[in-house]
Amino acid sequence: MIELLKKLMGREDLTFQEASELIQWVMSEDAVAVQASALLVLLQAKGITDEEMAGAAYAMRGRVSKINAPQDVIDTCSTGGNGISTFNISTCAAIIAAAAGAKVAKHGNRSNTRKSGSAEALEALGVNINLGIEEVERCLVEIDLCFCYAVNHHPAMRYAGPIRSCLLYTSDAAD
């Protein structure tokens, strides 16, 4: 990771492979919090390229706990941490879309930068967000709406979550 740190300090772009390796490392028990924080901050400050975002997404998709869903399912994943301080639009949109007949697999987490993330909003409505994969799939089948709580669907984020929480912004590369 030292080589990536040097590269980012020089404001050099990472390759797809380097970005993927970085995010895999951040999401591992081997990650050193101070180094991971520095790397994520430098990446954000430099500006994340499409290649870096694709590498990060590839790394995350390789470690996700997937649900079985129909082809026509949609997701209203939150943009959280956008700095605009809006109310929880993505959660409202998920509920409205499902009520209108769409199949919605809402993905989200607790807030990192505002008062209420999707998890807090749904808990306030009495929703049990800590469901296993099979229970989430059953919700999607029975009511055309489910919540994929990030902590349960991205178990490797248990390592990255505390690192991201200590930063003053949400790092797009690890969302």
Per-range role (PLM):
Residues 78-83, 108-114, 153:
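Acidic, glycine-rich active-site loops and adjacent beta-strand->loop/helix elements
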Residues 45, 91-105, 123-125:
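Alpha-helix C-terminal capping segments
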Residues 57-80, 133-162:
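Self-splicing inteins and homing endonuclease
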Residues 1-85, 100, 104:
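Acidic, glycine/proline-rich low-complexity segments that act as flexible tails and inter-domain linkers
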Residues 169-175:
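Conserved small/polar residues in nucleotide/adenosyl-binding loops
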Residues 82-94, 114-116, 157:
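Short glycine/serine/threonine-rich phosphate/pyrophosphate-binding segments
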Residues 75-76, 104-108, 129-132, 147-149, ...:
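General beta-strand structural signal in soluble alpha/beta enzymes
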Residues 121-139:
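A glycine-rich helix N-cap at a beta->alpha junction
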